[in-house]
Amino acid sequence: MNGTEGPNFYIPMSNKTGVVRSPFEYPQYYLAEPWQYSVLCAYMFLLILLGFPINFMTLYVTIQHKKLRTPLNYILLNLAFANHFMVLCGFTVTMYSSMNGYFVFGQTGCYVEGFFATLGGEIALWSLVVLAIERYVVVCKPMSNFRFSENHAIMGVAFTWIMALACAAPPLFGWSRYIPEGMQCSCGVDYYTLKPEVNNESFVIYMFVVHFLIPLIIIFFCYGRLVCTVKEAAAQQQESATTQKAEKEVTRMVIIMVVFFLICWVPYASVAFFIFTHQGSEFGPVFMTIPAFFAKSSSIYNPVIYIMLNKQFRNCMITTLCCGKNPFGDEDASSAATSKTEASSVSSSQVSPA
């Protein structure tokens, strides 16, 4: 074996020289140079510096502006809330650990950080599933004139948390485990060992199939059908130009969110799957560290995409930041332009940007 397995950790280095130490007790500078840990620390500080205000303002602006409290926005707010929690409970832990060169919070802290990282990623994924289904049902109309109501949105939010907990919680109760990964400063599910004592193999397979492949299949199916429907409607002029434009704008925003999710998480999932299917193979600590830390940037991009592509929300954000006044003076126009179709809360033939 090219790694060293301990009772609650796995170090991607053989202990032939006797230098390997527990990542909960000693700095791991034999895995990487101290400056590399400093880079990780600076990166996490940047994510906190950006992620905290962006997600907080997304929540605050929506609470302050009643017109933004629409059904589809509940799902997007759910994303912001989960990301905010990740920043506070996960990123701060990882930053401090990187500063010290090892996971200073012990095994309990590792479970906490791993849980919130997994929970946040899964809430994001299942929220995108709910958004994809909403887009499919509203635009493709398989259920005739379906209206995405507040009750549907609440059920969608509850569904994302149930599915995310079904993925993140089992390691807390003995099915698999959370261990330090890569350079041993952040924690995640144990992809490195089979660990029969905690039935690790079955959990990793369950996680990949139920909480990664199936959601992606649903998302690609919904958007595949949606693209075909939009093209057919445009060709046949079945909807008004305003409605078609509104549907396309909402769909574009959600598709961009999906693309960025894939950019952030597919490298991590691919590396994890490779490690799991090549037990004992040789790989360096940076091999898992880079995709793991890159995946954490997902806490920032959804609110940014939402703010960039949603004129109504962007104007409300500017108004809030400027103490109730919009220096660009187009808030009312934006509100009027979107009031007909905001957030899929009207009939299925009238959909606009959330």
Curated annotation (Swiss-Prot):
Subcellular location: Membrane; Cell projection, Cilium, Photoreceptor outer segment
Positions on the Extracellular side per record topology: 1-36, 97-110, 174-202, 275-286
Keyword Zinc attached: no
Processing and modification events after translation: Contains one covalently linked retinal chromophore. Upon light absorption, the covalently bound 11-cis-retinal is converted to all-trans-retinal. After hydrolysis of the Schiff base and release of the covalently bound all-trans-retinal, active rhodopsin is regenerated by binding of a fresh molecule of 11-cis-retinal.
Annotated lipid attachment (S-palmitoyl cysteine): 322-323
Chain residue ranges for the region called Disordered: 331-354
Gene Ontology BP, a term: absorption of visible light
GO terms for cellular component: membrane; photoreceptor disc membrane; plasma membrane
GO molecular function: 11-cis retinal binding; G protein-coupled photoreceptor activity
Glycosylation (residues): 2, 15
Transmembrane segment boundaries: 37-61, 74-96, 111-133, 153-173, 203-224, 253-274, 287-308
Segments on the Cytoplasmic face: 62-73, 134-152, 225-252, 309-354
Coiled-coil annotated residue ranges, if any: none
UniProt KW keywords: Cell projection, Chromophore, Disulfide bond, G-protein coupled receptor, Glycoprotein, Lipoprotein, Membrane, Palmitate, Phosphoprotein, Photoreceptor protein, Receptor, Retinal protein, Sensory transduction, Transducer, Transmembrane, Transmembrane helix, Vision
Major localization listed first in the record, in broad terms: membrane
Site (Plays an important role in the conformation switch to the active conformation): 113
Functional note: Photoreceptor required for image-forming vision at low light intensity. Required for photoreceptor cell viability after birth. Light-induced isomerization of 11-cis to all-trans retinal triggers a conformational change that activates signaling via G-proteins. Subsequent receptor phosphorylation mediates displacement of the bound G-protein alpha subunit by arrestin and terminates signaling.
Protein name as catalogued: Rhodopsin
Organism: Rhinella marina
Lineage: Eukaryota, Metazoa, Chordata, Craniata, Vertebrata
